[in-house]
Amino acid sequence: MSFIQLEGQLEPRFILKVLWLDANVAIAVDQVVGKGTSPLTAYFFWPRNDAWQELKDELEAKHWILETERIEILNKATEVINYWQDLRNQGKSITMKEAQSKFPEVTFSGSN
């Protein structure tokens, strides 16, 4: 499993999940519960919708999530979306495995 963990935090509380597709990238967050996880958000798709803004709104609605955790999650989501978009703008295709190696703290799934 891959985790978003704040510095000094004993146990990670959230996992950023990415659905890596040719025409879209989708992001979601799971909450770590014990030794497992539970979905915290739906998947938000880019560029079909503004995935980053939708994720931000969803996280802000959960008042028990610390601001530092929200920022960490959103910063990582920004990196992943920008990476996918930059590759697409250059006409390049990258496998999910390559994306996973660039972002080892993120959990990827997809069709390639």
Swiss-Prot record:
Q: Name one GO biological process term.
A: translation
Q: What GO terms are given for molecular function?
A: structural constituent of ribosome
Q: Which NCBIfam families does this UniProt record tie to the protein?
A: PRK02724.1 (NF002740)
Note the InterPro entries from the entry: PSRP-3/Ycf65_sf, Ribosomal_PSRP3/Ycf65
The protein in question is named Probable small ribosomal subunit protein cS23
Highest rank taxon of the organism: Bacteria
- This protein's GO CC annotations: ribonucleoprotein complex; ribosome
Per its database record, what is this protein's job? Probably a ribosomal protein or a ribosome-associated protein.
Keyword line: Ribonucleoprotein, Ribosomal protein
Question: What protein family does this chain belong to?
Answer: Belongs to the chloroplast-specific ribosomal protein cS23 family.
Cite the record's note on assembly: Part of the 30S ribosomal subunit.
One Pfam family in the UniProt entry: PSRP-3_Ycf65
